[in-house]
Regions:
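C-terminal catalytic "cap/lid" subdomain
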Residues: 1-262
Length: 262
């Protein structure tokens, strides 16, 4: 995290406008275990697994994202001389979402119709607040949750949140960091990197991805197709991960199929 924050400082000092988007699921999981409220997951049709976010789980998730991860990032950036401001999608109605409909899923080995899941899909992004902060020389540090039209707080995926925000801000770059070198043809072989991934071949890329990587790939492809010029899925574990991604590391998503790399 410190290395990525140092990259943010370097970019800001060079005159770039940077928005940091983060999640906090891992921190929330640890807090939940500490509180005796460990995370639970839904397995829907097709085997897709997602966080079960009932009211209690949403409270824990907010503790992790807004109470632990965000303050740590803001303080780290501030210590490096970056004027960071912490926000969530709820602030200024920045990000609105549509709540997921009741659906049949398996929870704790039991199949049921889930009606109390407070998760949703992003419906709109208003970039006014982050744009105002950027114009004033601040670096926004933004995360879920989002807000429904009815005023409910909803959990949304942080990677797709980042993609939607990048599109709304007409960003030149979107760098999505992960714990692998990028999209791999063989997930067990870190040297099997897909260097260039045409966004119109999303289904093929999703077949290569597994677990959380599927969401990251989908988010990257969506941003690319919506006009973000440079979209990279890269390794967040390396030194200077953001600068490395901008210099060519990781998987770059491109619009043109003829740019496909083997």
């Amino acid at each position: 995290v410190r290395s990525a924050c140092a990259d943010v400082r370097t970019l800001v000092e060079a005159g770039a406008e940077v928005v940091v988007v983060h999640g906090g699921g891992a921190a929330a999981d640890r807090i939940g275990v500490e509180l005796g409220r460990p995370p639970r997951y839904l397995t829907g049709r097709g085997g897709r697994r997602s966080r079960y976010t009932d009211a209690d789980a949403l409270d824990v998730l907010r503790l992790g994202i807004l109470g632990r991860v965000k303050p740590d990032l803001v303080v780290t950036l501030a210590g490096m001389g970056v004027s960071a401001v912490g926000l969530s999608g709820v602030d200024g109605r920045m990000v609105t979402a549509t709540r997921n409909r009741p659906a049949r899923a398996t929870v704790d080995g039991v199949e049921m119709v889930v009606r109390d899941d407070l998760s949703g899909r992003i419906a709109s992004v208003d970039p006014t607040l982050p744009r105002t902060l950027l114009d004033a020389g601040f670096t926004p540090v933004i995360s879920p949750p989002a807000l429904s039209d009815d005023g409910e707080t909803l959990n949304v995926d942080a990677d797709r949140f980042a993609a939607a925000l990048a599109v709304a801000l007409s960003a030149d770059w979107l760098v999505v960091l992960s714990d692998v070198p990028g999209l791999l043809r063989d997930r067990h072989d870190p040297t099997s990197l897909v260097a260039a991934a045409p966004a119109d071949l999303l289904d093929e890329h999703l077949e290569l991805a597994d677990g959380r990587m599927k969401v990251k790939v989908r988010a990257a492809a969506e941003a690319c197709q919506a006009g973000v010029g440079n979209v990279v899925l890269a390794d967040g574990r390396v030194d200077s991960p953001v600068l490395a991604a901008c210099a060519g590391a990781g998987t770059r998503f491109v619009k043109e199929r003829h740019a496909r790399a083997s």
